[in-house]
């Protein structure tokens, strides 16, 4: 009997290979070309286009073990993880699929054969459900599989009818259920298959996609019905191994053992501890796989879900007594258990570990402070007899301390409290509105309906500017002016010109559009920019500098060659830099944006931390070494599928056509790219990285220059060095040493100044003490002093308080057109007088506000001329 999780996984795939299925590897957790999904959450996701008839995969039967995440979005199990035996954020789904090949009879027969003969589950424990109107499936189960009629249950559309959407492919489904026995679940005598307890476990769902539903709800039979099945590996392992929880299987045993060693909390001894142990075990798998598939923690989208999962695990670690980062230490355990099935994890082990550690450290910085505030709020609510954490508190924890809302809800759950979700959303909307008001960007321009109209009329442009072509002849097919079609453009008029064929590159993929001229008989049009509003349309934007251009005119198109060559050099350099970065820093580097101009290049990429200077130097040196090798830059046009098999780097989420250009630079770089490039790497000349920065969570940017601009940059830097060296009267090569000495001298002098200030303050404080007056038995000292900043004023006040021993002090100073006030109350008087209350009453005298503790408070205001009046006000208060 097969029991081990790894054996079940392999036996399933091998079984269906024996039934003529192609074994298909798991797809990424990031759904390809499907913006409707946050994560891959089922085995059928990667086959969606095959089911819709939009893709021919070359096989009609498939079997897979798909990694899935259900957290965030429509399918969200996050808040239940840890509290139940079955919920997971990450799990593996076994599935077999038919694209217009076999149907119900085979799907049912093979499912039954696998469970009863391969896994050897007892037949008497298995139940099935069918859609209430699916007589065909009912007969197959009853007559061919010989399942007793009392163990075949007909259910309605809600339970047993699957739909891809409101319209489109749909069909009935049949679920195979395992009865764990009377000793499991609610224990009620009337317990049945639809009871919410744990007795009856759904193991396998067989979906028979046989209809097309229209907007009126009418079902039309599909010409080629499909099969889509799904079975959770973790759940099947629990049944096969005879345990009551997925977490008790061998799939989780190594992780739980490792967590128990780290925390000193054995699994199975204390239910509260067990919840946290299960949370950490599940989340350790999720974060490893999500990061491995290229997702980084951030405050939006998939990155935010990852952050929520990771921080929830960190918080449960704290409940188990872990006050230091620990989750990253579980990465090797996850990878060791999964490396045979997902070998790419092994290559990314170091990277995944670093990302997790970095995020743990960030959260640890704010976790304690946030927990303290939340605990104070919980105590306050309990005293008040209320049970809901206000939305503004939830928002503050989210905005200031990085607590996702579900983490806050999870924490207060133990105190039987809930959070005000609506109040939180209102606070979020206020913040969004402020952001909208302060945003000055123009946003993405909508594609003009005019371009769409031209396209439907059959007007298109073929780009002929690859392979260094900068000249071509063509014919004007359309002229536009102020978003209107015109028949001609006259001298001095601005507009857009469209031709049948052009060597001008229209801005797309980060490469800017070309400039140049378009010339006809007694007509010259200056091209100031070239755009690509549609895939098949290129627009030349500019003005007529001579004559008149008309629709139908024959023209000669001349690209500004120097600018094009410089742009090409920067584009090719971007490819080299990406390849160099992958070599130096790891294959997790993925392009998330770029800009290529004639002057410079900008490359945005996924990475979790600042690139150190030595790493930048390695990247630059490696790229320049490839330039010196003068490798040929070869471009091939291939079908997309064939191109992807070559291992060429592709931009994630980029929409590619059926055929793509593959740009190869020797053995160093290979990318899918539709832009223009130089002929050999030596044409780039030289790359110089000039800046590296963070532009968003998990996204960084490199800026660089090449060729002549790189030389100009080096020359500017050299001139600045010479200028600084001349001022300091040293050689440029000794400049660093000289600056270090100057900084040390400055620090020494600053220390000396502080020492002198302290001595003067001590002397002044001794002199001022004689001015203290006794009012109602309390020594009160008020004085205007010479303090250039708040720190000096505080230092001076501390010395006065130490010497006064008992009393109230109010001192003030004028600096940079403002008044500063400091109030101090010695500890023996803080039960009668509060420095904070005193300063709040006096601050308005100088036009300001203030506050602080009972023993010390400060204020500032824009009316220094009222300082003396403010100081006298203290005596009146006492």
Curated annotation (Swiss-Prot):
It catalyses: tRNA(Ala) + L-alanine + ATP = L-alanyl-tRNA(Ala) + AMP + diphosphate. SMART domains: tRNA_SAD. Signal peptide: none annotated. The keyword RNA-binding applies. One of its GO terms (cellular component) is cytosol. Binds 1 zinc ion per subunit. InterPro entries: aa-tRNA-synth_II/BPL/LPL (IPR045864), Ala-tRNA-lgiase_IIc (IPR002318), Ala-tRNA-ligase_IIc_anticod-bd (IPR018162), Ala-tRNA-synth_IIc_core (IPR018165), Ala-tRNA-synth_IIc_N (IPR018164), Ala-tRNA_ligase (IPR050058), Ala_tRNA_ligase_euk/bac (IPR023033), DHHA1_dom (IPR003156). GO terms for molecular function: alanine-tRNA ligase activity; aminoacyl-tRNA deacylase activity; ATP binding; tRNA binding; zinc ion binding. It holds the Pfam family tRNA_SAD. It is found in: Cytoplasm. It comes from the Bacteria. Belongs to the class-II aminoacyl-tRNA synthetase family. This is Alanine--tRNA ligase.
């Amino acid at each position: 009997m097969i029991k081990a999780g790894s054996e079940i996984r392999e036996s399933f795939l091998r079984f269906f290979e024996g039934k003529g299925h192609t074994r298909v590897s798991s797809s990424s957790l990031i759904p390809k070309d499907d913006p409707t999904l946050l994560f891959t959450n089922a085995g059928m996701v990667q086959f969606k286009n095959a089911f819709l008839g939009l893709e021919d995969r070359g096989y009609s039967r498939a079997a897979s073990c798909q990694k899935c995440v259900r957290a965030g979005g429509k399918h969200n199990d996050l808040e239940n993880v840890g509290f139940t035996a079955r919920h997971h954020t990450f799990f593996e789904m076994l599935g077999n699929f038919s694209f217009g090949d076999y149907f119900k009879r085979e799907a049912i027969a093979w499912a039954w054969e696998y469970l009863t003969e391969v896994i050897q589950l007892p037949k008497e424990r298995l139940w099935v459900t069918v859609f209430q109107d699916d007589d065909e499936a009912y007969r197959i189960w009853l007559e061919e599989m010989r399942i007793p009629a009392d163990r075949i249950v007909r259910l309605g559309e809600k339970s047993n009818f699957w739909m891809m959407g409101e319209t489109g492919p749909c069909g009935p489904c049949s679920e195979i259920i395992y009865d764990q026995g009377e000793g499991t679940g609610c224990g009620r005598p009337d317990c049945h298959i639809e009871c919410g307890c744990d007795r009856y476990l759904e193991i396998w769902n067989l979906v028979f996609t046989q209809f097309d539903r229209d907007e009126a709800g009418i079902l039309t039979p599909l010409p080629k019905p499909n099969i889509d099945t799904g079975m959770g590996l973790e759940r099947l392992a629990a049944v096969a191994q005879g345990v009551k929880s997925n977490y008790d299987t061998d799939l989780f045993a190594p992780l739980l053992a490792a967590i128990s060693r780290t925390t000193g909390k054995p699994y199975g001894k204390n239910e509260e501890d067990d919840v946290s142990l299960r949370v950490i075990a599940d989340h350790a798998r999720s974060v490893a796989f999500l990061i491995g598939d290229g997702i980084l923690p951030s405050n939006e989208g998939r990155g935010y879900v990852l952050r929520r999962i990771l921080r929830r695990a960190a918080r449960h670690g704290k409940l188990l007594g872990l006050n230091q980062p620990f989750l990253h230490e579980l990465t090797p355990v996850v990878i060791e258990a999964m490396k045979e099935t997902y070998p790419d994890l092994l290559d990314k082990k170091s990277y995944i570990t670093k990302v997790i550690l970095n995020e743990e450290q960030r959260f640890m910085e704010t976790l304690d402070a946030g927990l303290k505030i939340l605990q104070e709020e919980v105590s306050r609510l309990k005293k008040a007899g209320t049970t809901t954490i206000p939305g503004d508190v939830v928002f503050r924890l989210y905005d200031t301390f990085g607590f996702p809302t579900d983490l806050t809800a999870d924490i207060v759950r133990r105190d039987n409290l809930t959070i005000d979700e609506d109040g939180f959303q209102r606070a979020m909307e206020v913040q969004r509105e402020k952001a909208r008001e302060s945003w000055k960007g123009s946003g993405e321009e909508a594609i003009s309906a005019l371009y769409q109209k031209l396209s439907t009329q059959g007007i298109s442009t073929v780009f002929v500017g690859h392979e260094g072509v900068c000249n071509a002849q063509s014919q004007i097919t359309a002229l536009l002016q102020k978003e209107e079609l015109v028949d001609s453009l006259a001298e001095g008029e601005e507009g857009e010109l469209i031709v049948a064929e052009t060597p001008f590159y229209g801005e797309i993929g980060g490469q800017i559009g070309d400039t140049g001229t378009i010339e006809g008989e007694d007509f010259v049009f200056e091209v100031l920019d070239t755009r690509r509003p549609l895939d098949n349309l290129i627009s030349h934007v500019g003005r007529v500098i001579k004559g008149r251009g008309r629709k139908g005119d024959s023209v000669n198109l001349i690209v500004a060659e120097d600018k094009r060559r410089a742009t090409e050099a920067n584009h090719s350099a971007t490819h080299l830099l990406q390849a160099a970065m992958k070599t130096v820093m790891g294959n997790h580097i993925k392009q998330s944006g770029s800009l290529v101009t004639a002057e410079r290049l900008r490359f945005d990429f996924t990475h979790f931390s600042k690139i150190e200077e030595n790493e930048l130097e390695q990247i630059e040196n490696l790229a320049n070494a490839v330039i010196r090798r003068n490798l040929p830059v070869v471009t091939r046009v291939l079908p997309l599928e064939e191109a992807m098999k070559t291992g060429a780097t592709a931009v994630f989420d980029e929409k590619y056509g059926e055929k793509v250009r593959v740009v190869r630079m020797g053995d160093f770089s290979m990318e899918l790219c539709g832009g223009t490039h130089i002929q050999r790497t030596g044409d780039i000349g030289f790359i110089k990285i000039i800046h590296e920065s963070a532009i968003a969570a998990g996204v960084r940017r490199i800026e660089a220059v090449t060729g002549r601009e790189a030389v100009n940059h080096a020359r500017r830097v050299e001139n600045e060095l010479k200028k600084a060296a001349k001022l300091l009267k040293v050689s440029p090569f000794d400049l660093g040493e000289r600056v270090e000495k100057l900084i040390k001298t400055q620090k020494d002098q600053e220390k000396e100044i502080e020492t002198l200030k302290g001595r003067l303050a001590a002397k002044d404080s001794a002199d001022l003490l004689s001015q203290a007056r006794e009012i109602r038995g309390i020594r009160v000292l008020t004085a205007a002093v010479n303090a250039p900043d708040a720190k000096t004023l505080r230092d001076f006040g501390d010395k006065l308080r130490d010497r006064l021993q008992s009393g109230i002090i109010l001192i003030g100073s004028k600096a940079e057109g403002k008044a500063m006030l400091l109030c101090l109350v010695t500890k023996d008087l803080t039960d009668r007088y509060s420095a904070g209350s005193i300063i709040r009453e006096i601050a308005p005298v100088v036009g300001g506000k203030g506050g602080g503790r009972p023993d010390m408070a400060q204020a500032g205001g824009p009316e220094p001329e009222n300082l003396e009046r403010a100081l006298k006000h203290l005596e009146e208060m006492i």
